[in-house]
Amino acid sequence: MQVTETLSQGLKREFQVVLPATDLATRLDSQLAEMRAKARINGFRPGKVPVAHLKRLYGRSIMAEVVQEAVNEAHRKIIEDNALRPASQPKIDFPGEKDELEKAFEAKADFAFTVALEVLPKIEIGSFEGVEIERLVAAVSEDEIDLVVNRLAEQSRPYTPKEGDGVVATKGDKATIDFVGKIDGEAFEGGSGEGVDLVLGSGSFIPGFEEQLEGLKLGDSRTVTVTFPDDYSAAHLAGKEAVFDVTLKALAAPGETVIDDAFAKGYGLEDLTKLRESIKANIERDYAAASRRKWKRALLDALDAKYAFDLPEGLVAQEFDAIWRRVEAEQSQSGRSFADEGTTEEAARADYRKIAERRVRLGLLLADVGDAAGVKVADEEVNQALFERARSFPGQEKMVWDYYQKNPSALAELRAPIYEEKVVDHILSLVKVTDKAVPKEELLAADEEDEEEAAESSAALV
């Protein structure tokens, strides 16, 4: 087998491989001889089938196996002899002329093909000196704990049925209703319900809906007209007027919830003090998670600005395709277009291309940093992640577990974010971190990019 490098440009490599006809013939004969020893064909004694007969029957299929084995061998040889780190699977090009391929398959001519691949870049990690990030922290106030306690009390509020002639719905009542909603005279998906409980004044339904039920008598019906908010989550309903035919089936008046130790015991806690401590711990966990999202984004921004290196085009294209498929799926589901977002498809493609490049860059960087630092993910950690994933599919836990166990690539997708978080923590220990106390509103301020890119690089770690 002769291997010649024909291209070395940036991260692109290309090699020409020539397998002499004599080598092909030798490999074919070896396979036929092995088959002859085991072949059982009517009319011939075991092990005595003429090679020529076997070749006539199976020669072409065996030669296909020989060629595939030679291609795999060439790929391994190229990687090992040149100490390459391939970024993805190679592209194999066979002879364009059918006659050439036929001659090679008959071992009458040399078999030549090309192997093209991209390699991973060499990243000079260096030190993280000069990288500084700010970590936002917020304290949990007693008022915040009170809000949660009061919300729990509201959720467990007792209700007493309101019965008799002349009973009408008032604010605070729990109304049980049937309703059918229509837009332009046509019923729409999700616009109907039966036996639905609604606390009037809770703001659970579309603005204006609950207020129009006040004063409605038990058993009576009323037509309610509302307009969906312009920013309604279902874009095809946003800003549209809807008419609901509502029937009041039952009413219940609100009682009072006493917030004491007995109330706390209803939530499995020893007393009210323990309940408040538990609530505080939960809020602190939420704040810590929000803080992590923000400082992680800041750290990734700093790393993205610090490091510049060539990216394998294949990985970028793969990441972009994954992003674009999600964008198209979201548009299809929401009914919104690029014009609705104030942009064009061309501009959106350019923006998402930059995001794909960023994700690949950070993924490759974190992979190299983790490798240099000896970061490992234990099987127990992957199994725990798999357990949590399976729990999110009640009744199908075993099916989910078995799927991941049988699909290494799926398991790798579970492993990647765990590995990434460990590498991020390692880098955090090496950079300068300054804690900054802020109000909870600043810490929890909605930032789509925090959510979008909190785990943005893990795709490139798979």
UniProtKB/Swiss-Prot annotation:
Location(s), subcellular: Cytoplasm
Q: What is its EC number?
A: 5.2.1.8
Q: Which Gene Ontology MF annotations are present?
A: peptidyl-prolyl cis-trans isomerase activity; protein folding chaperone; ribosome binding
Signal peptide extent: none
Q: Does the keyword Cell division apply?
A: yes
Reaction equation(s) it catalyzes = [protein]-peptidylproline (omega=180) = [protein]-peptidylproline (omega=0)
Q: Which family does it belong to?
A: Belongs to the FKBP-type PPIase family. Tig subfamily.
Entry function: Involved in protein export. Acts as a chaperone by maintaining the newly synthesized protein in an open conformation. Functions as a peptidyl-prolyl cis-trans isomerase.
Matches recorded under HAMAP family: Trigger_factor_Tig
- The molecule here is called Trigger factor
Specify the species.
Methylocella silvestris (strain DSM 15510 / CIP 108128 / LMG 27833 / NCIMB 13906 / BL2)
